[in-house]
């Protein structure tokens, strides 16, 4: 297994669907989209449908019964007007999301998902489901895995690289090969912060941005919780993620 990491969607090569392209893609948005997706599916959401475009989200959501849908979204870390929830993993509790389709759009994570949606296998990872995703990849043994960070508005993010390093650490320990310098750097970052990942999230520029917006202590704690979930959010149709458990 050859594993590469790309900091943001714009860095992903135009090789998807070609013989040089990935056999599996893993999207990362630690603060907070892929953490929220993992917890929502763990807590019984029917699926999470991701949109980069808000107009498309609103249009598609109208085709779903109102009592079985929720709109989740943020821009700049703030909940969108008219939406049911923002992008907090601690808000997607079972009594809120059980059995519902979540229509989701965020500043960064949903763009990264759209970039790789044509890869044959698409998953999402965050720190809480790091080991579950590693186990799935090690079981299936795709030849080429591309991890894709979401970043912040097209720029590098510390926390996504931390999670890339965390996932790579588990894969490399089982024989996977590091295929680019970006992943090698992410491994070094994980080695530095693995004993206190929450501290890394808080010093990251997006972590500081969330702190300025208000008290997000519960979100930081949730997003930093390592290996707590057995769910692997997996694309089952374009843009739609469902729970696969390992």
From Swiss-Prot:
Known cofactor(s): Mg(2+)
Catalysed conversion reaction: (2R)-O-phospho-3-sulfolactate + H2O = (2R)-3-sulfolactate + phosphate
Keyword annotations: Hydrolase, Magnesium
Pfam families linked to this entry: 2-ph_phosp
InterPro entries from the UniProt entry: ComB-like, ComB-like_sf
Domain of life according to the entry: Bacteria
GO molecular function: 2-phosphosulfolactate phosphatase activity; magnesium ion binding; sulfopyruvate decarboxylase activity
EC number of the protein: 3.1.3.71
Family per similarity comment: Belongs to the ComB family.
PANTHER family xref list: 2-PHOSPHOSULFOLACTATE PHOSPHATASE-RELATED (PTHR37311:SF1)
Protein name: Probable 2-phosphosulfolactate phosphatase
Lineage: Bacteria, Bacillati, Cyanobacteriota, Cyanophyceae, Synechococcales
């Amino acid at each position: 297994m050859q594993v590469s990491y790309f900091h943001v969607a714009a860095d992903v090569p135009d090789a998807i669907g070609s013989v040089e392209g990935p056999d599996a893609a893993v999207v990362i948005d630690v603060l907070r989209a892929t953490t929220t997706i993992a917890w929502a599916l763990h807590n019984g959401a029917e699926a999470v449908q991701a949109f980069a475009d808000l107009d498309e989200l609103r249009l598609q959501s109208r085709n779903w019964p109102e009592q079985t849908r929720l709109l989740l979204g943020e821009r700049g870390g703030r909940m969108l007007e008219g939406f049911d929830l923002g992008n907090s993993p601690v808000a997607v509790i079972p009594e809120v999301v059980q059995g519902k389709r979540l229509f989701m759009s965020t500043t960064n994570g949903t763009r990264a998902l759209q970039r790789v949606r044509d890869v044959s296998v698409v998953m999402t990872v965050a720190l809480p489901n790091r080991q579950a995703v590693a186990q799935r990849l090690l079981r299936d043994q795709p030849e080429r895995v591309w991890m894709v960070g979401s970043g912040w508005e097209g720029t590098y993010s510390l926390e996504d690289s931390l999670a890339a390093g965390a996932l790579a650490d588990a894969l490399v320990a089982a024989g996977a090969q590091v295929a680019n310098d970006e992943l090698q750097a992410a491994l070094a970052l994980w080695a530095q912060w693995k004993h206190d990942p929450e501290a890394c999230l808080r010093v990251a520029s997006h972590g500081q941005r969330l702190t300025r917006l208000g008290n997000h202590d519960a979100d930081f704690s949730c997003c930093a919780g390592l290996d707590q979930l057995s769910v692997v959010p997996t694309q089952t149709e374009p843009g739609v993620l469902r729970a696969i458990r390992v």
